[in-house]
UniProtKB/Swiss-Prot annotation:
Name this protein carries in UniProt: Uncharacterized protein DDB_G0280279
Provenance organism: Dictyostelium discoideum (Social amoeba)
Highest taxon, organism lineage: Eukaryota
Disordered: annotated span: 1-38
Amino acid composition bias (Low complexity), ranges on this chain: 17-38
């Protein structure tokens, strides 16, 4: 049970940070570090359907 649980858990942990890091970096580079700004950027992106770089 232990090895089985550890295996998937370790894999997930590795994937999660990688994905989070990439998103954080993109958000930081595209716009200022702000929760609201990030939300706005996503909303605009969805509305226009084209990548917007601010």
């Amino acid at each position: 049970m232990f090895p089985n649980s550890n295996g998937p858990n370790k894999m997930k942990a590795l994937v999660a940070p990688s994905n989070s890091s990439t998103t954080s970096k993109t958000n930081n580079n595209n716009l200022p570090p702000n929760g609201r700004s990030s939300f706005w950027s996503i909303k605009q992106y969805s509305e226009t359907g084209l990548p917007i770089y601010i």
